[in-house]
A protein has these predicted regions:
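Local beta-strand N-terminus motif with an aromatic residue
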Residues: 91, 155-156
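S-adenosyl-L-methionine
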Residues: 1-120, 227, 256-258, 262
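Short, aromatic/basic amphipathic alpha-helical patches
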Residues: 105-117, 135-137, 203-213
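A short SAM/SAH-binding and catalytic strip from SAM-dependent methyltransferases
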Residues: 156-171
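Short, polar loop motifs at secondary-structure junctions
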Residues: 99-101, 124-131, 198-202
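Flexible, glycine-/basic-rich loop-and-beta segments that form/coincide
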Residues: 241-264
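C-terminal substrate-binding/active-site "lid" region of AdoMet-derived donor-dependent transferases
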Residues: 168-243
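Adenosine-cofactor binding site in Rossmann-like domains, unifying the SAM/SAH pocket
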Residues: 110-153
Length: 264
């Protein structure tokens, strides 16, 4: 066989390879169809605030580990969403920074709430443009923490932040974003703040948000597919629904022990 004859031969694929290709394209088409439906549903909810349009699901968005995406379980996302909504009014704004599963939970709760219930404004700050199916999306890159629409500055009453990476740089820049978004204290009560991140970030996080009164809570968020790092929830308030209390600090325990020893 000459080289010329070899070049003229048709390339053939094995049946198993063809089946794998067919499955790949079928899954791709199904995912595209799912996103189209989700986008239509999100737009419908935004325009008409329909109460029976069905539940949105974070499962429509496959986790991208390159984006450090690890979705919360539905139970955790709903709990955090309800804490953000507790006592909120319709003239408030809730910002969700790098925690899209909580944003989806907020959308579902507000979408199914009874008529007359307060419906605060939502804004999602997220790097993943797949979430552009939601009109509330604002593109966010923690490396440029203040590169955001000017109308969001000092506009948010409640904020949840889950920095994508367990690094001092990422945590510090995310804190800059939170400060930029927060309403000044003199205008209202202090911004209600929740930060969810690794246990090893505890000393840094509580220092970065000291002015907010942020403390470690006894609630540990659960991720849908598990997470090897120990994860904490930090907040500047204790839950009125008993979802969490603040953990006792070491210095508090020492002071209490000294007080008991004095016998007063």
């Amino acid at each position: 066989m000459t080289g010329h004859d070899s070049d003229d031969e048709e390339l053939t694929l094995s049946s198993s390879t063809l089946d794998a290709l067919k499955q790949f394209y079928a899954e791709r088409d199904a995912r595209a169809e799912q996103f189209a439906k989700l986008k239509a549903q999100a737009e419908e909810q935004h325009a008409a605030a329909a109460t029976n349009a069905g539940q949105l699901s974070i499962e429509a968005f496959t986790e991208d580990w390159n984006e450090s995406q690890f979705w919360y379980s539905d139970e955790t996302a709903s709990l955090l969403a309800r804490e953000l909504l507790d006592g909120a009014t319709s003239d408030m704004t809730i910002a969700v920074v790098s925690a899209p599963s909580v944003f989806v939970a907020l959308k579902n709760i507000l979408n199914t709430s009874s008529p007359g219930q307060p419906k605060p404004k939502l804004v999602l700050l997220e790097h993943d443009n797949r979430f552009a199916v939601f009109p509330e999306l604002v593109f966010y890159d923690f490396a440029q923490p203040l590169k955001l629409p000017s109308h969001l500055k000092a506009s948010c009453d409640r904020i949840i932040c889950d920095p994508p990476f367990l690094s001092e740089d990422c945590q510090t820049k995310a804190a800059l974003t939170v400060r930029w978004l927060s309403k000044p204290h003199q205008q209202q009560q202090q911004t209600r703040l929740i930060v969810c991140t690794g246990e090893r970030m505890e000393s840094l996080v509580t220092r970065l948000y000291r002015s907010y009164g942020l403390r470690t809570t006894d609630y540990e968020p659960v991720h849908a597919r598990g997470l090897s790092n120990e994860f904490y929830c930090y907040a500047n308030f204790e839950s009125s629904s008993s979802s969490w209390k603040w953990r006792q600090r070491e210095d508090e325990g020492k002071e209490e022990g000294e007080g008991e020893g004095q016998g007063k």
